[in-house]
């Protein structure tokens, strides 16, 4: 059992939870087996028709809520750096009014355990795919059938996955998670509970990698901190290794794990927004190690072994440079 635990109270639909993915990846990649990370699903919206956030104009009217939620996501993406889709959001409908299905789907993934061939499934990878499908692809992930199809892309058997989503065990875990949110007075997603040898610290809301590492260092009395190892220097070789490890990465994910400084006044979505990153990416593209492609209102970098690896044509590059 690991001494350092981080529990993330979240909802897969929450844009700030999507925006916290770079930080969670950085913790996983930099700290490795020193930390245990788990998620508690809190269900941000039980029913959009009875939900009310007057400041953001979300709740009540379904069509208006979809439009305003997309506006909020687009504005937030320039801050947190994870892209969102540029087409209209149709997340909620008269038949699908809750974010509970996405929460339940993640829990089902944790209960699923093994594929038919005995290979272990990866719930966290499915969580990321579900968040990406919701935010970037604008998929109708409130629909159980859509979620089952998404799960299939990560190795889950769709029918078994849907059966688990409907199971008592999964719904009990879901209810326990909501009860835990109530116990810790969690109303903001994401919220982080850092635990170390009986001591707990709560960080409420979207935060930076630097801030969470400061809290980790404090609660562990400096025993767990970022090492200045050569493997984490922001070199082309190290960045290539990181992208290869995950298969793909958005610019902000690379900048976060390698602690690249964001240039003031620039959107968090772009490569040129981070000091030193343009030169690294240019070198990797020239070597054929990665390919950069448009993704939503941002860009993604694919490792050369990724199924979606496809270098940009000269026409596409010219279009991007003129944008």
Identify the function of each model-found stretch.
Residues 1-7:
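Extreme N-terminal starter segment of soluble prokaryotic enzymes
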Residues 16:
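Short, cysteine/histidine-rich loop/knuckle motifs that typically chelate Zn2+
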């Amino acid at each position: 059992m690991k001494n350092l635990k981080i529990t993330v109270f979240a909802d897969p639909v929450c844009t700030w939870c999507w925006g916290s993915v770079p930080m969670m990846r950085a913790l996983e990649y930099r700290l490795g087996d020193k930390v245990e990370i788990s998620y508690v699903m809190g269900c941000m919206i039980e029913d959009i028709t009875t939900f009310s956030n007057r400041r953001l104009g979300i709740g009540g009217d379904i069509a208006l809520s979809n439009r305003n939620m997309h506006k909020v996501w687009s504005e937030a993406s320039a801050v947190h750096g994870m892209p969102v889709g540029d087409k209209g959001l149709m997340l909620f409908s008269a038949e699908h009014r809750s974010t509970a299905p996405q929460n339940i789907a993640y829990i089902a993934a944790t209960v699923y355990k093994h594929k038919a061939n005995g290979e272990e499934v990866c719930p966290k990878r499915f969580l990321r795919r579900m968040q990406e499908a919701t935010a970037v692809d604008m998929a109708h992930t409130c629909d159980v059938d859509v979620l089952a199809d998404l799960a299939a892309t990560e190795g889950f058997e769709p029918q078994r996955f849907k059966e688990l989503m409907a199971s008592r065990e999964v719904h009990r875990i879901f209810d326990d998670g909501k009860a835990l949110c109530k116990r810790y007075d969690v109303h903001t997603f994401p919220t982080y509970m850092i635990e170390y040898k009986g001591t707990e610290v709560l960080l409420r809301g979207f935060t930076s990698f630097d801030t969470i590492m400061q809290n980790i260092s404090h609660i562990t009395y400096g025993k767990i901190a970022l090492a200045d190892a050569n493997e984490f220097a922001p070199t082309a070789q190290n960045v290539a290794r990181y992208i290869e490890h995950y298969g793909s990465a958005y610019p902000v994910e690379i900048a976060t794990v390698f602690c690249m400084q964001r240039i003031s006044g620039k959107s968090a979505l772009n490569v040129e927004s981070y000091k030193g990153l343009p030169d690294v990416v240019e070198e990797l593209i020239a070597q054929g190690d990665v390919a950069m492609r448009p993704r939503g209102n941002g860009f993604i970098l694919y490792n050369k072994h990724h199924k979606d690896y496809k270098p940009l044509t000269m026409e596409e590059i010219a279009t991007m440079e003129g944008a």
